[in-house]
């Protein structure tokens, strides 16, 4: 098992070796299971995935954990960059 604090800041890479960004937060359900990772996108990923970069700050997507293939020095996804285009941006409540 890995501590949540050790996940934050880890790089997130697609299965085709595209650097998506890094984990900024995790979302949990009522049973304390991680349901989504919030990934702060790189500038390149923001453009590649079709998001508009805000004047200040970054775009963050909410990626369901079933898309994670492996956790090590980096987070490896089971999707390629094209398959990420349907992942929504995280909206603040």
Residue positions per predicted region:
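Peripheral interaction segments used for macromolecular assembly
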Residues: 1-93
């Amino acid at each position: 098992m890995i501590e949540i604090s050790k996940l934050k800041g880890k790089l997130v890479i697609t299965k085709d070796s595209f650097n998506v960004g890094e984990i900024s937060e995790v979302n949990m359900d009522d049973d304390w299971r991680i349901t989504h990772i919030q990934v702060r996108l790189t500038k390149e990923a923001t453009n590649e995935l079709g998001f508009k970069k805000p004047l200040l700050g970054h775009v963050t997507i909410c990626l369901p954990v079933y898309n994670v293939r492996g956790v090590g020095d980096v987070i490896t996804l089971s999707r390629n960059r094209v398959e990420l285009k349907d992942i929504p941006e995280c909206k603040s409540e």
